[in-house]
Amino acid sequence: MASRTLDFSLDKYQELCEVLAEHYRICTVFEYLSEKPEGNIAIVRHDVDRNIKNALRMAEREHDQGIRSSYYFRYPYTFRPDVLTRIRDLGHEIGYHYEVLSKTNGNFEKAVTLFSSELEEFRKICPITTICMHGSPLSKYNNRDLWSRYDYHSYGIIGEAFLSFEQDNGDLHYLTDTGRTWSGKHSLRDVMRTAPGNGNPEILDTTDDLMGWIAQGSAKKLYLTIHPERWSSNSGEWLVWSALDFGMNLGKKILRRWHS
């Protein structure tokens, strides 16, 4: 039965965390890649594209529920040393949300140099062992293509939040809140190219749909990507982000038609 809590609110996210904790061992990207845990596993990743304060609110709620997850920050847009430190101290993983191919207009040599320098800025604050590409939907460059020419392991990185799972995902189901839905229909680059999940437009639209699907035992291994700005703390904020998501989804639809 659907909850009356407003979808894509922090209260709804707390409900989702409760369902996840009931059915899975929840882990960070680093924990999954380094420990290779067995059983019912849920990886929870946050891409902090905007609204740093909301990321901290989420991290605090997760901590109160005994959950540790991964938070990936963009440089310099969401790079706030005080917030990174606070979230790290709550027990969460901090990662680098890189977008260097987009920033350098596809110049690989400049991009890898920029990657190294931005990574060092993060490491002045806390250890960084995993990275995650930013989708940059308005750019023609796919940031993860950087690793077709270079090896992130040479920078002391054990894994990339897409590529490492595409190489060995088994029965891992990948779902993202991109576009204010769990269906995946608004994702351009936020996809796990070899995962059996990647959303299901017919059954997974709302967070209530997702929670019901989880409760049915539909996936042994689950990988969720969450964007903190999408989960509002009040009705005014919810209306603003709902309108922004509507505009972004429309823009992506135009881009798909343009490139088709």
Spell out what each predicted region is.
Residues 74-77, 99-102:
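Short, acidic/turn-prone active-site loops that include or flank metal/cofactor-
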Residues 79-82:
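Active-site-adjacent beta->alpha loops and helix N-cap segments on the catalytic face
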Residues 93:
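Short glycine/serine/threonine-biased micro-segments
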Residues 1-45, 49-70, 84-90, 101, ...:
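Terminal accessory/targeting
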